[in-house]
Amino acid sequence: MIDLRSDTVTRPTPPMLAAMSAAEVGDDVWGDDPTVLRLQATLAERTGKEAGLFFPSGTQSNLAALMAHCARGDEYIVGQLAHTYKYEGGGAAVLGSIQPQPLENAADGSIPLDKIAAAIKPIDDHFARTRLLALENTIGGKVLPAQYVADATRLARERGLATHLDGARVFNAAVAAGKPVAALAEPFDSVSICFSKGLGAPVGSVLVGSRALIDVAHRWRKVLGGGMRQVGVLAAACLYALDHNVERLADDHANAAHLAAGLETIEQVKMQSVATNMVFAQFPQQHCAPLEAWLKERGILTQMLYASRFVTHMDVSRDDIDTFVAAVKGYFAAR
């Protein structure tokens, strides 16, 4: 089966499974799991932060970060396309009583600086207290421009705001930019990093930041049900991914470019963008459902919408992409 729906569908490889089965474990709620402790320390060092905290999901690590930065009645500024606003069930509002202030993203995924500045509310009992700027990198596959990140985080600091980066795919951004991940993490007070996407682990996210912030997030992790016991078996997969699956993300980026080039040869398809491991393209609305079914019958899983996303990952080869493009061509040729 060729699965282009997301990089979350990656499966652990036999060497990763071997690392998991050999993991030394303890009770992580007691702080006794040596493999979890090693993962947290390793990622903190790699990102240039003081401490790290292991979570079962990126949604939970983002939520704990927001709740660590903001109190009830506070507000965070965020892009309308951001995962922390659009795709996490409104958790910040539902569970943290934190109000989002969504702003329109520019074409490159950034939030215009003048819009950020204008959205910061004055200190007044009538308003929610603006406390945090939350960005995402990559966003829609796009790497945020480094100068933009520097300017946006500087603006936030000057106005008394903390900063959080949803870095679910920050290693994709680092590989694409040719920079160490610490350079992308440095401007932010906290960063969440996901291991169950392009890095290929079955589960896991780590939040990094200052020791004081992580201490607060640790309590919120417990409240949110994220405290786990002998979870070193999962942390071992993340450590394996850090050692073996980061540099190979460049292959996914090259495969995405190859996929986009193939779709561009099909008259009925309108390319929108390709960046890192994501390709966005438009298909005629009336063909989306039948094309998705056609592809599934041929062993290809997609989510065909008017504006469709295709995501490359370690379980998709160059030959798989050629098979997919040929199948799309075959579908339109038969009509």
Segments and roles (model prediction):
Residues I2-A293, R298-V316, F324-Y331, R335:
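Conserved PLP-enzyme active-site core in the AAT-like
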